[in-house]
Amino acid sequence: MERDGCFGNCWLRRWEKSDMNRKGFGGHRDAKQLSRTKNRFARLDPDTQSRYEDDDEPAVPVRASLTSASSRGRGGSSRGFGQSAASIANTGVRNADIVYKCRATGAAKKVDAKWLIKQLNQIIENFKPLLWTDNARGDFEWYVRDEDTASTIRANNRRVVHKESGTRVEFYTSKVPAPWMKLKREEIEIIHRVVDKRHNAENRVLDLSNFHEDEEFKAKDMMMNLTKGNVMLTVLDHIDDKYGNIVALSLSNNRIRHLDYASALVSIAKFVMELDLSHNHISTEKELEKFAGLPVERFFFEGNPVVESFTQRAAYISYIHQSFPRCNMLDGVEVQPLVVGPDLDIHDAMPFRAGYYPNPQIRVLVEQFVTSYFDFYDGPDGQRTRRNLHNAYDADASTFSLTIEHLRGSSHARHHNDECFAQYAGVSHNVLKQERFARHRASRSARGAMDIAVALSKLPTSSHMRDTFIVDVFLQSNDLLGFTVQGLFCDGDLTQTPSPSFFSRSFLVSPRENDSVAVISDQLFITVASLDRLEKFKKLYDQSIANGAAVEQVSAVQIAQIGVNGMGFDGAPALPIREEMIKAMCQFSGMIPPFSEKCLADCAWNFDFACQKFNEIKSSVPAEAFAH
């Protein structure tokens, strides 16, 4: 009984103590009480409020701790000091994007980072590494966001060779949670609006100085400092989408200490010639190296602690030139640049053209074919009229294949019609995913004119927006002509509100009699057109309309010899006429047929011009060219 009474008293004292703690009488305050007290004093004296400068820390990757049973205590218990499922769920990892961590093992000891980035840029289109660093083991580490880039890096394992040292770079990738947290959609939209209003389109200038003090942030009581990795990445993503052609950028007065996240500017804003990093908190010399590669000519860096470490101006200028060798104005004072090269006027960018044609005659031929082809292909009765397209294909040697895939940036977009998507996916011939149809590969492509016509008639009805067509001729020879048609189209129920998709169709055709051609190869690619992609396509298309289609300049002799009626794509006449011309050239020159044919071909099958050229170079023609 005494034992029970003692137990009861002890239990009562513990209950009273815990109850006092909950009520605040036990001398212990919980986190909510501390937060309320801190905020109350902050309202009385704003200087006591945190500036959140502790957010500006170097990026630390999220590490997954895998603890074996033997390290969890006696008996292999999964409890003890281990984290429960509930505690892991509250760590914030679920609020992070899944990215790909890439590692070049031992490369930091053998090759330069700039060299390796250059090699990867040549292999991977639009390569944008994040948080590039080298660890204590001598490895280069960085992150990429999309799986395609990670797969390409992994596929080039030991294929990148440093010729001077003979080093073959080994690449490894792994899927990990991103070391930055995701922002809410509302926060991202506000950041985009703030960036938009700070952009000067006329001068191509983006002013992000005092970014966190923008009135729109203050009105919503938001702390959107550029010292936070997720905020900086959101800003950089928006720059990449809309303002990649800026020539001047200001990041002054943002309390920036580290440039790990901002270093992505090197692959995003490649034309920045004026950069303002003044009045930040950069204190180490190595930070500025992360911006090396930008063609900066005017640089502002005053007001950073690292500047005070230089006692001589020459040393300060030399330090800046290590990252920006073209810098000719530093902190408003002219300096002698380390590298002087030809001035490239980035305003004279290569114009986006509305396609390419080798000559006007080929343009007429291609446009007539495209118009006639889609007259049969489109319309509410397209599944019936497409059967007539068997006349457009070679009877036996023609092939047709279709691929539907999401392009980068629209991976989460969905086709507007599930039934149409299922029809496309059922015959999709994506060679990157051929393991899915390796056993029945023959069913994914059609061969022969009749089989192709049947395959086309089974596809959903469509209506192509012909005013969006862009045509590029990529191959021209005497026997083959290759061209690509790309643009927008609608499919499915054409009576509903149009929801356009993007297509690219590559034709390979050969000449036939009576001014006609026959399709040898037809490859159709379809993808969902997201709103962002539609906006970009419209901008490019408007620019192409202003610039017009590119047509190669040819001489009057070539134009006179190039035609469609009975001639090949390179201007050669039909075979009977060609044989007669070769025979006449043999009689005129005394050369054997192969050399006579070459002489005529070099002169665009202009007989008079070929005879004139032969008389000019007769003395230099080799003896074996003449009949004995």
UniProtKB/Swiss-Prot annotation:
Annotated InterPro entries: LRR_dom_sf, NTF2-like_dom_sf, NTF2_dom, Nuclear_transport_factor_2_euk, Nucleotide-bd_a/b_plait_sf, NXF_fam, RBD_domain_sf, TAP_C_dom
Localization (cell): Nucleus
Start-end of each LRR repeat: 245-270, 271-294
GO process annotations (BP): poly(A)+ mRNA export from nucleus
Alphabetical list of Pfam families matching this protein: LRR_NXF1-5, NXF_NTF2, Tap-RNA_bind, TAP_C
Main localization of the protein described in the UniProt heading: nucleus
Gene3D superfamilies tied to this protein: 3.10.450.50, 3.30.70.330, DNA helicase RuvA subunit, C-terminal domain, Ribonuclease Inhibitor
Segments forming domain TAP-C: 576-628
GTP-binding found in the keyword field: no
PROSITE patterns per UniProt: NTF2_DOMAIN, TAP_C
Superkingdom of the organism of origin: Eukaryota
Annotated region (Disordered), positions in chain: 47-83
Keyword Disulfide bond: no
Cystine pairs: none
Limits of the RRM domain: 100-179
GO molecular function terms noted in the UniProt entry: RNA binding
Assembly information from the UniProt record: Interacts with nucleoporins, Nup98, Nup153 and Nup214.
Domain notes: The leucine-rich repeats and the NTF2-domain are essential for the export of mRNA from the nucleus.
Family to which this protein belongs: Belongs to the NXF family.
PANTHER family found in the cross-reference section: NUCLEAR RNA EXPORT FACTOR, NUCLEAR RNA EXPORT FACTOR 1
Role noted for this protein: Involved in RNA export from the nucleus to the cytoplasm.
Protein name per Swiss-Prot or TrEMBL: Nuclear RNA export factor 1
